[in-house]
């Protein structure tokens, strides 16, 4: 009889330990694959899961490349982008999209294709961030604003090729 309470405590402790390990693994998995978290820069960007097999590590590598290769562009991404979706949408398999709505008055959601590799992904992130900045500045969406953002992705491509 005296052994049962200790046995019950051990069982409860074991269940809590297993639950703690499961929760820790879940949190690490979510952060590893679905969150860019840069404590030093106060930058947190969520990443949606890919429905077509693209790995979010390309987006994380692109953000790390921006962080070291173009700190100013990295700060802009951190300030204006809350979520990155790696699934092809309106930009198709080679581009990206900026979604503008009243819900994006804070930080925006962008779609980014990772199909063409790291440097192209960086350029798409910078391009779509340019649209987010235009929107947050209150500029009306017009086709001629596209020229400015194409200039931004061209600039970052040239800068990173020289950086590498």
PLM regions and their residue ranges:
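Short pre-active-site segment immediately N-terminal to the catalytic Zn-binding motif
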Residues: 109-125
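Auxiliary, metal-adjacent structural segments of Zn-dependent hydrolase domains
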Residues: 41-104
């Amino acid at each position: 009889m005296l052994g049962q309470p200790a046995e019950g405590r051990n069982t409860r402790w074991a269940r809590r330990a297993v639950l703690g390990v499961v929760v820790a693994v879940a949190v690490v998995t979510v952060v590893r694959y679905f969150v860019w978290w840069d404590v030093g820069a106060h930058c947190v960007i969520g990443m949606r899961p890919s429905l077509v097999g693209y790995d979010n590590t390309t987006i994380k590598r692109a953000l790390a490349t921006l962080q070291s290769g173009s700190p100013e562009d990295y700060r802009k991404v951190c300030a204006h982008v809350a979520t990155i979706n790696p699934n092809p949408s309106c930009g198709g398999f080679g581009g990206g999209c900026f979604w503008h709505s009243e819900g994006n008055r804070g930080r925006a959601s962008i779609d980014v294709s990772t199909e063409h590799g790291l440097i192209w992904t960086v350029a798409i992130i910078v391009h779509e961030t340019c649209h987010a900045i235009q929107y947050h500045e209150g500029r009306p969406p017009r086709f001629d604003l596209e020229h400015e953002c194409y200039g931004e992705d061209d600039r970052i491509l040239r800068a990173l090729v020289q950086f590498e």
